[in-house]
């Protein structure tokens, strides 16, 4: 029987994205560059009207841990809930830019 330890447990990082293209790369890079690597990074594009959605897609092409969900704007809580529905991690972390 295998038990998850704190060093092997999957962590889901949910990042709602709405019109933050200027800060998005810094935010995502800070998560990617963490020493803990057993992560899934869920970028929820909440109907951005800037280039945020495209930036999210570019990140998903270079890192298989990154998943992107594009949705109609519903606000921060809705974006978080959509991310929660997708998340598979034992632990959940919400990150804002």
For each predicted feature, which ranges?
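Short aromatic/hydrophobic "clamp" motif used to bind/position activated sugar donors
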Residues: 92
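Catalytic metal- and UDP-sugar-binding loop of GT-A-like glycosyltransferases, i.e.
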Residues: 71-72, 95-97
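Glycine-rich, basic loop-to-helix element that forms the pyrophosphate-binding segment
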Residues: 71-87
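Alpha/beta-hydrolase active-site loop signature
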Residues: 19, 48, 75
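Acidic helix N-cap motif at the loop->helix transition within catalytic regions
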Residues: 25, 39, 50-58
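N-proximal low-complexity "stem/linker" segments adjacent to membrane-targeting elements
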Residues: 1-32
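Structural signature of beta-strand start/N-cap positions in the alpha/beta core
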Residues: 12, 37-40, 64-67
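A conserved acidic beta->alpha catalytic loop
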Residues: 30, 45-54
């Amino acid at each position: 029987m295998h038990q998850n330890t704190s060093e092997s447990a999957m962590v889901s990082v949910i990042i709602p994205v709405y019109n933050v293209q200027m800060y998005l790369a810094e935010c995502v890079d800070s998560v990617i560059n963490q020493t803990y690597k057993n992560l899934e990074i869920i970028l929820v594009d909440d109907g951005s009207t800037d280039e945020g959605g495209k930036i999210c897609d570019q990140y998903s092409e270079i890192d298989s841990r990154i998943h992107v969900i594009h949705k109609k704007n519903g606000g921060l809580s809705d974006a978080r809930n959509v991310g929660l529905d997708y998340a598979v991690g034992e632990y959940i972390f919400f990150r804002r830019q």
